[in-house]
A protein has these predicted regions:
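Low-complexity, intrinsically disordered or signal/transmembrane-proximal segments
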Residues: 2-3, 9
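Cysteine-centered catalytic environments shared across enzyme families
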Residues: 8-248
Length: 248
């Protein structure tokens, strides 16, 4: 979500990495967060263990007091960083409480995604309505799960380099990681010079990719698996005008 303050445009953002290295993990994630400080003027937060480091820069949209990130699950087994806004989070929250007995620590849409994942698993991505990019870390299995919204409104970049998986809202956060190697992607550069845009899933940096819209991923420390949870169909439907409006 965008918000104007004193003629400056801000939006939330996150950065993170998975993998070991001969460096100070807390210092690296803090520096990665500083690279995207312009995205979140309200607060910052981080989570670091021996496998993963997550950093967040926050612009308050919903739940000013209770939405600081990263957010941990009540049982302490999962942690999430999230950029975006979920329009139907109240409906999902109600279902989680009434049908599954879930308890919430905050009123934020972020925690709804986290509890939804713990309850429904990977299916939660297709249940969300809104614009979003997020990563959830399982502290017990040391696996990652993340997703990007249906139409790619919220950015999500990733790179696998020297045994590390880097991910975030902006590529510039990767520049603060010791394993990141800067190299121009000549194929993407050609596309940009032709179209003034890079239509590929690649970016101007070699080895850095966009997570496709309508896609979620899992990562176990070795293999990154991507799954398409949404693919628009254009088959003609025999619906009335009122039915179509309701679906929209």
């Amino acid at each position: 979500m965008y918000q104007f303050r004193k003629d400056v445009q801000f939006m939330c953002g996150f950065a993170g990495y998975y993998g070991a290295g001969d460096f100070n993990r807390e210092e690296v994630i803090d520096q990665m967060g500083e690279r995207i400080a312009h995205r979140g003027p309200d607060s910052k937060g981080s989570f670091v263990d021996d496998y993963v480091a997550l950093g967040f820069r926050r612009l308050s949209i919903i739940d000013l007091e209770g939405g600081s990130q990263p957010i941990h699950s009540a049982d302490g087994k999962h942690v999430i960083i999230f950029n975006g806004e979920i329009y139907n989070y109240q409906e999902i929250r109600k279902e989680l409480i009434e049908k599954h007995g879930c308890q919430f620590q905050t009123n934020s849409d972020t925690e709804v995604i986290l509890q939804g994942y713990k309850t429904y698993g990977e299916k939660i991505a297709s249940m969300l309505r809104g614009m979003f990019a997020f990563v959830i870390y399982d502290k017990e299995t040391h696996n990652l799960f993340g997703a990007r919204d249906y139409f790619g409104i919220k950015p999500f970049y990733y790179a696998q380099m020297n045994g590390s998986l880097l991910f975030g809202s902006e590529i510039k956060s990767f520049l603060a990681h010791p394993h990141f190697h800067k190299e121009v992607n000549k194929d993407a550069l050609k596309m940009y010079l032709i179209f003034q845009y890079t239509p590929l899933l690649e970016t101007m940096f070699k080895g850095v990719f966009k997570l496709e819209p309508g896609t979620y991923f899992t990562y176990d420390g070795k293999e990154l698996k991507k799954t398409k949870y949404f693919d628009p169909t254009y088959a003609k439907k025999d619906r009335s005008f009122d039915e179509t409006v309701k679906l929209i």
